A protein has these predicted regions:
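Positively charged, small/polar-rich N-terminal and surface patches that mediate targeting and assembly
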Residues: 2-162
């Protein structure tokens, strides 16, 4: 899993004062999507989506809401208050989406190279990616966070993951 577009000059995320939990997910300034390769079997697709989300949550401030306590006081960890759509695309479209998103300084991009699902030791994953030219890397998923209108232009009309 790699963070491929973490611009130094443009911070992607929400300031604490922007986190308004009364807003609809469609009213949030930023949109978060994870696009998964439609050719993956269900278990690998779910794995790819989760692995793309992990570095996104760690790198983009303000995506998670506050913890929620139920009526008995049991605390449930915060979830993405802005929502996160998990979409599917064929591998060529996934690559094109990744390329478009990376070209935008106002978007955050994290990807899951296919090597992440074919290695069991993280140093092997690093070696596999490190010896592969960028154009030869296949992707299982890409996570994108950015201004709503920009993300919509990047992803087009992709369907939700079934």
């Amino acid at each position: 899993m790699s963070v491929v577009n973490a611009p130094e000059t443009t911070a992607v995320g929400f300031a604490p004062e922007e986190m308004d939990y009364s807003l609809s997910t469609r009213q949030a300034r930023l949109k978060w999507v994870v696009v998964v390769d439609s050719g993956l079997p269900p278990g690998r697709a779910a794995n790819a989506a989760v692995c793309a989300a992990a570095p996104t949550v760690a790198s983009v401030p303000g995506l998670l809401g506050t913890h929620a306590a139920d009526a008995e006081g049991v605390v449930h960890p915060g979830l993405p208050w802005t929502g996160c759509s998990v979409l599917v695309a064929d591998s060529a479209t996934l690559r094109a989406i990744r390329t478009k998103a990376m070209s935008r300084p106002d978007t955050f991009v994290a990807d899951v190279p296919a090597a992440a699902q074919s290695t069991r030791v993280y140093s092997d994953f690093i070696a596999a990616v490190g010896t592969s030219p960028t154009e030869d890397i296949e992707y299982c998923a890409v996570s994108i966070v950015g201004p709503r209108n920009r993300v919509d232009k990047i992803i087009g009309k992709l369907p939700l993951m079934p």
